[in-house]
């Protein structure tokens, strides 16, 4: 089907999760608007409620009022943490405000490098002691967190968020360098400042945080979801569609816009809206995922579907996450010709998608299968949608 019409983009999932976790820093009332209605946000709200947060959600689930008084439990249970990778983000605020935390480790005690090590080693520099026992991180900072100079060994969105939140209540000054600079991190930083935090970006990937003792009430509107926006732009490009995307900041989407122009889409952009018209001929392209402002790993699966329709062979190199090619077996069921070599997918073009019964493995795989179904011949049934 050719998509035509106008779509208003939801609030950002990837900004909502750390912002919700950051509310744990304060005992004041906080109001958040433009929350997206997605499973991970609901799970994060349940996690906060299980710890004692008082949460009121509006009928349309778009606005939330939250208050975290002194009766917050400093434990985040496995049951909720296991369904959401971002749950680890409560570690920083709990240690900053209460000096202790018992948080289920995402993925338990796997041997070898775990991304969580970046969080823990950085927190150690701020005075945190920790042990991992039975899949739980038992951490404490008996004398409170102390400001430190921290250079992340690798760019990590989660570690940047956790340490930025934690540093807001630390004694003295913290300087974080080699930070992730995704727009969602800038949104988190703006939210923390709206509560009274002292945060200054002193370089492209460097931020200075001066600890404060108390926070004030805040009303904050969460930014738009750039991954949803990118997905909708691809939906417009894939089958000669004609879509108007609103509720966005087009300057944040420059990478996606440039990519789609290269493959042949016609794009007319204004500050808060984009009109995209898909071309009959889709040009092939080779891409690799990388930290912002590079191609987002969260849009890789959707781009793969688009490149299945290209005129020649394309490649996608996944440089951020392992296990990010899980949609490929399902796309093959729909007639896609894709070969995986290590962290690279080789995509043969000119695919004529055929309807099939398929199963989603994660949120982005769900979106990619919907895109494939849009231009498939026949009926497609997608189960386990996220």
Question: Where would I find each of the regions flagged by the language model?
Answer:
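Short, structured segments at the rim of ligand-binding sites
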Residues: 1-386
